[in-house]
Structures are given as C-alpha cells and as structure tokens.
Amino acid sequence: MKLLTNLKKNRSYVVILLLTVLYALLLSANPVGDAYSNAFASQSGEDMFSPHHLLYAFYGNIILKLFGFLPFEPMTLLQLANAVVAGGCLLLIRRMLKRIHHEESFLCASVLFCGASFGFMRFATDNECYIVPLFFCLLSIYYLQVFLVRNSMSWLLK
C-alpha cells in the first residue's frame, strides 16, 4: 500500500524508468555510418580523439573495457550505454523542472514529452555521440541552477 502511494506521488520517476527500458529494448536496427565508425574507433582504440566526435571514442573504449565481458556486440553495448545516459538526462530534466513547478502531473507530462520526442529517442537508441554531451550540458545547467538558488547574484551588479 505504501509502495503504491509513493509511486503515485512520484509518477515521473516511473515514466523515466519506463522510457529508459523502452530505449534499451528498442535499440536501432539500422545504425548510420557514424555509429559504425564510432563503434570501430571505440573497439580498436584507433583515432580515439577524432575532431569529428571528440572524446566519444574514448568514452566508448572505456564502456567496452568495463562491460566487454557481457555477451553483446560492441555496437549493442554502446547503444545500451546511450540508453542509460538518456535516462540520466531525463532525471536531470525532472530535477530542474521540479524547482519551477512542483506538481507531479506537470513533471510527468514534461518528462514524457521530452523523452518521447523523435530526436531524443533517436540519439538514445543509436550509437551516436550526441546524448552524452547533452547529459553533461544538462548536468552543468542543473548545478548552475543550484548555485543561483542558493546564492545571491547581487554582487555582480556592483
């Protein structure tokens, strides 16, 4: 009974969990050329710091070294990592929106709207490099928001 009450109070977390599971179950079946290039660079260790997708091959190489023992192809493993990072993006979006509006139905609808958009789902389910920088961008905005809420910025005006 208490679990159902907590789930009702925090429906947006359930939406985030369901979307993350959906991303992980519905990985892209026809990846683009960049996805193959990223997987090859991550697996081989060559061209790790390509200016085209700076640091993504390095990130992929770390993922493959940490979870390479799992019975997945490198492309699938990197797609799963992107799905998990996409779930992290949705958590950050929820945290930022909660400061603006506390109503759970608003949070639930907003997270669903962001998480179910085509662009977000495409990069969450494919081996593309855009979801990881989005996560770090949202993380930096979240911490900027925390700073601005806790500290007064009046000293900037002097």
Where do the language-model regions lie?
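Short acidic/glycine- and proline-prone juxtamembrane loop motifs at membrane-interface regions
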Residues: R122-Y130
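Membrane-helix interface segments
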Residues: P74, H102-C108, R150-L157
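Transmembrane-helix signature of polytopic, membrane-embedded enzymes
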Residues: I93-A116
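Loop-to-helix entry region of an early transmembrane alpha helix in multi-pass inner-membrane enzymes
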Residues: L54, F69-L91, F123
